[in-house]
Amino acid sequence: MYTILLIGIGGFIGAVLRYSLSGWVQNSFVNFPLGTLVVNIVGSFFLGLVMYLSEYQGLFSEETRILLTIGLLGAFTTLSTFSYESFRLLESSKLMQLTMNIVATVLFSIFAVYLGKISALNLAAYLRGIK
């Protein structure tokens, strides 16, 4: 029950953050789903960061990792919105924007996880040097 509560709290925070950031970014870009793209890239970075700090550096407890990854980041990032927005671009025959959206989301999200990993390793090395 405690784990479900942690996921729910994290999910609430992640959903509110996603709504806020995505809406703020999207206000400037009407014809391209930049808000969702930014949210997915930022979320991928933080997922990489948290997972590497947690799994390989032992920096977070299992409860904190669950709250941050399954709860907060699970609600923050969204494949369903990406899929819907991509389909709408296809439906509108905006094939160039569709291609850009798919390629940018996949490549930048994977790269963001990599940057999260590198950041986690650097942070862990820095923290070990402080001790």
From Swiss-Prot:
Tell me the compartments it is located in. Answer: Cell membrane
Kindly give the Pfam families that the UniProt entry links to this protein: CRCB
**Residues that bind Na(+):** G74, T77
Means of activity regulation? Na(+) is not transported, but it plays an essential structural role and its presence is essential for fluoride channel function.
| Family as reported in the entry's similarity comment | Belongs to the fluoride channel Fluc/FEX (TC 1.A.43) family.
Offer a single GO CC term for the protein: plasma membrane
Designated name of the protein: Fluoride-specific ion channel FluC 1
What reaction is this protein's catalytic activity?
A: fluoride(in) = fluoride(out)
Q: What does this protein do?
A: Fluoride-specific ion channel. Important for reducing fluoride concentration in the cell, thus reducing its toxicity.
Gene source species? Methanosarcina acetivorans (strain ATCC 35395 / DSM 2834 / JCM 12185 / C2A)
In the bilayer, the protein is annotated as:
Multi-pass membrane protein
Q: Which UniProt keywords apply?
A: Cell membrane, Ion channel, Ion transport, Membrane, Metal-binding, Sodium, Transmembrane, Transmembrane helix, Transport
Residues that span the membrane, as ranges: 4-24, 32-52, 66-86, 95-115
Q: Which GO terms describe its molecular function?
A: fluoride channel activity; fluoride transmembrane transporter activity; metal ion binding
Gene Ontology biological process terms from the UniProt entry: cellular detoxification of fluoride; fluoride transmembrane transport
